[in-house]
């Protein structure tokens, strides 16, 4: 954010459109998980504290997540991209702690993770 003088008053101006508006963030605590093992450990920790957590991840992790709450993002990175925001909206209505699978890579993965990281307020497990 930069400063500009207008009519003798200093005002702040966004340097880029992405800085102008706040991005969507769930109203409940949300974190990203480096890998599915971290997600499961965080889930178990939060459940032991009395929270009602959910893991938001792709189907490839269904066997690892087992009987824990899971909102599926589909199979592919493209599915993840299409489904992430509707999954977050659903999660914040039904659960009080959201753990989101991180994607690793460049291109589409990095672009999506930029938004997901902002939605989680930069919190990672």
Label each residue range with its predicted role.
Residues 1-4:
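A conserved active-site cap/scaffold subdomain adjacent to cofactor or substrate pockets
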Residues 11-13:
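NAD(P)-dependent aldehyde/semialdehyde dehydrogenase
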Residues 15-121, 125:
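A C-terminal functional module that forms or caps the active site or interfaces directly
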